[in-house]
C-alpha cells in the first residue's frame, strides 16, 4: 500500500491524478496539496482516502514542507508558479527552487519515489523542425527548450519554462544517486482539461488562443506537432500509476527521464523506454 502526496492539485493534471489514485486499491491515502485558495470550492472534501492539504509551497517554511512530506512515502510533483509556457525567468526560477526544497526534503526523510512532472517544452524548439525527425527518434535525452507559440499578442518563445524543466530533471537524477531515493521525470505531452479529446487539440498549443487566431496563424505542421504529443486520460492514469509503482532495480540508474505521450502513429516521440523501464502500456492513438 502506498501513501502518495500530490502537489499542484488545484490544476488540471494534479486534480486528475487525485481522482484516479483515490480509486485504486494499492493507494492507501492521497495527500492533495494546493494553494489555500484552490480549496475554496471544497474540492476533494468528500472523497474517501483523500486528505486536502492547503499549503503554498513557494513560501512554506522548511518545517511545513517536512511535515507535509512525512505524510507520504511517495511524491508526485505537478506544482509550478506559472503552469503556462509564458512563465518569466523569475517564475521559472521560483518553480525550480520550490521543487528542489521538496525533493531534498523527500530524500532526507527517506521517501523511496519522487515523480516529477516535466514537460514537452523541454524540447519545444524542435517544433520548428519536427518534420525532419524520424518516428521514435525524439528520446528524453534531447534538450531544446524554446517553444514558439501564438498568443493573442503575437508569437512568444517559452525559454524559461522549458529550461527550468530540464534543470529540474537533471537535479532529480542527481538526487537519486544516494540514500535509496528513485526518481522518474516525465516529459508530459498534451493532456487537456476534462474529456481531453483529440479533436479539441489546436495548432497554437495554447489553451488561451482564440478560435479565429488558431485558424489564421497556425499551420498544419504545428497542428501535427501538438497532436502527436497527445496524452489521453486513461494513458495518463496508466503512466503515473506505473511511475509510482515500477521497481527501480532494473533501471540503468535510480533517476530516469521518460517521455509521456500516447501511442500516436508516426510520432517522433520515443516511448519504448517508458514501456521497458516502468511498464507503461498506452492504449490510445490520436489518429485512430
Locations of regions flagged by a protein language model:
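N-terminal Rossmann NAD(P)H-binding glycine-rich loop of SDR-like oxidoreductase domains
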Residues: 4-26
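Active-site YXXXK catalytic motif of short-chain dehydrogenase/reductase
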Residues: 95, 157, 161, 165
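Alpha-helical substrate-binding/gating segment
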Residues: 173, 191-194, 199-221, 230-254
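Conserved C-terminal active-site "lid" loop/helix of NAD(P)H-dependent oxidoreductases
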Residues: 254-281
